[in-house]
Amino acid sequence: PSATLTNIARGGVVDDAALAAALRERRIAAAGLDVFEGEPKVHPDLLTVPNVVLTPHIASATVATRRAMASLAADNLIAALTGATVPNPLNPQVLPLRASRG
């Protein structure tokens, strides 16, 4: 096999037990994960396969990233409170509801 699976998205996107089986049976060459189905716990089967790299999900734990996150949140909040267009909504489907209420 030549496939390598990488999951840095969210736990639950990948079935950890099925992935461990695929790695053990060499249907997948390797995997790299920093999120897990049952976070914060790692599926025990993943701990037994040598062709997986498991790391903590801490990519956003830098001063620069946390400042950017705070700025983004503040920009969204100010826009929402002043009636301006929210620049980065997580649920844009609700914006027309807000507009229709005046």
Where are these regions (language model features)?
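Rossmann-like dinucleotide-binding domain for NAD(H)/NADP(H)
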Residues: 5-102
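Short glycine-dipeptide loop
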Residues: 1-3
